[in-house]
Amino acid sequence: TVCIFCNSIDSIDSFYRLIPELSNACTFCSEDGQYKLWKGNRRKKSMMITKLERYNFFTSRFYSAVDIISPNPPHVIFISDLFGATQSVIDPATEAIQIIGRFRGGVNSVTHIASIRPDLECMSSTEIDDWIRGASTVYNNWKSQLTRTSNIGERTLLQEAIGENSYLPYLDDKGKPDPFLIANFYEKEQVKRLYTSTDLLCDAYRQTDYFVFSHEERLMPVSDNERMAIQHRLAKKKRAELIVRKLEEMEKM
């Protein structure tokens, strides 16, 4: 039994597209994820964990709180695709341990396959401090302006700005800063930073004192940027030229 944890339906969908002969597989995900897989006719999917198949994909809703019953200790794989899905990062100190804890009968092995992205944008604690302070100032100014003006145009634009902005995810239902949501903001950025360096990610695993850790780094003939270009961005002619060039390079290796 193999259990694969990846918080990206697009990444999971790509497995089915790239390995069409993949059989005995099921994806456990949200209703939205099920719809995307259904549109692509991608094997079995479920919102509830029932009987496991030989290969089982899980999105983040199954990272914690839910026991996963397996007839035998499974091989567990984490996948973090930093070029196609930055939300697929996994925190070694929390999520990785929580996932393993879901298997009450233990696991056979744990493997984390991750791409490292040195140019990944992530904020330091100081930068987050500045962002929150600046966003709070602007947001509160909007609210003050709204109480002072009776001009319909001003009120309309201020209400639109107050009702939809990037500061709202860190406020509670009363419009006040939510300490838990803000703390989560810091944590997410710290975890993203781990994936800018192999050393940072490996050190994070070692510091948990939970895993018997070993590391293997592989440089692939086709980079993630090239893979994304082939899949999405290039015109057919350019895509074909890139594929031919990479095949020629691989023959010389």
How should each PLM-predicted stretch be described?
Residues T1, P20-L22, K44-E53, I68-N72, ...:
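Flexible, charged surface loops at secondary-structure boundaries
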Residues T1-P20:
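Conserved strand-helix element at the start of the C-terminal RecA-like helicase core
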Residues F5-S8, F57-S60, I79, I113-I116:
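Short His-Asn-centered micro-motif
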Residues I9-I12, D32-Y35, F62-V66, D81-V89, ...:
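Short acidic, S/G/P-rich loop/turn micro-motifs used as interaction or catalytic elements
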Residues D32-T59:
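Conserved helicase ATPase core of P-loop NTP-dependent helicases/translocases
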Residues R54-V76, A96-G106:
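SF2 helicase motor core recognition
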Residues F83-V110:
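Conserved SF2 helicase motif VI
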Residues D130-M253:
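The feature captures the C-terminal accessory region of ATP-dependent helicases
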